[in-house]
Curated annotation (Swiss-Prot):
GO terms for cellular component: HslUV protease complex; proteasome core complex. This is ATP-dependent protease subunit HslV. It comes from Campylobacter jejuni subsp. doylei (strain ATCC BAA-1458 / RM4099 / 269.97). The gene is hslV. The keyword Transit peptide does not apply. It is an enzyme of class 3 (hydrolase).
Length: 180
């Protein structure tokens, strides 16, 4: 498991949201508390976030963004092509990072081994050291609270930040709303 972050993605009825905390840790030391580990891709139609080695994650972001462009914004095709490229490249197989990517139709976890996983419920996924805390909170809030999608993500990450020592409560979110 990667120590240093928590990323949570939620594909709700009206919005898709990704959020992340701002903490960067090196061993037992907090280096930075306001890092941004999420991005908008494909003119804001795809959201992505990473956990793991920052340098590795930037390489993965660039590679994924290129595949997303070559697939004309088709997230499913880009995720599959990403996995194929990852498996073929010996250098990529050694990268220590994970990504969450989502749009209004799909949500995928791209693992450090080149796997592409769509969550069983198709709605909520989390990565990073506080990922399981955020995932648990998000599932409970989705089931029992009447929160807007962005508030659900923020509240879940807040809970993770209060529990996980590698996660803080400096939360940043990006949202994709249904076109009206």
């Amino acid at each position: 498991m990667f120590h240093a972050t928590t990323i949570l993605a939620y594909k709700g009825k009206n919005k898709s949201v990704i959020g992340g905390d701002g903490q960067v840790s090196f061993g037992n030391t907090v280096l930075k508390g306001n890092a941004i580990k999420i991005r908008k891709l494909n003119n804001g139609k795809v959201l992505a976030g990473f956990a793991g080695s920052t340098a590795d994650a930037f390489n993965l972001f660039d590679m994924f963004e290129n595949l997303l462009q070559s697939s004309k914004g088709d997230l499913l095709k880009a995720a599959i092509d990403f996995s194929k490229e990852w498996r073929k490249d010996k250098y990529l197989r050694k990268l220590e990072a994970m990504m969450l990517v989502l749009d209004r139709n799909h949500i995928f976890l791209l693992s450090g081994t080149g796997d592409v996983v769509e969550p069983e419920d198709g709605q909520i996924a989390a990565i990073g050291s506080g990922g399981n805390y955020a995932l648990s909170a998000a599932r409970a809030l989705a089931k029992h609270a009447n929160l807007d999608e962005e508030e659900l993500v923020k509240s879940s990450l807040q809970i993770a930040g209060e529990i996980c020592i590698y996660t803080n409560t400096n939360i940043k979110t990006y949202v994709i709303e249904d076109e009206k």
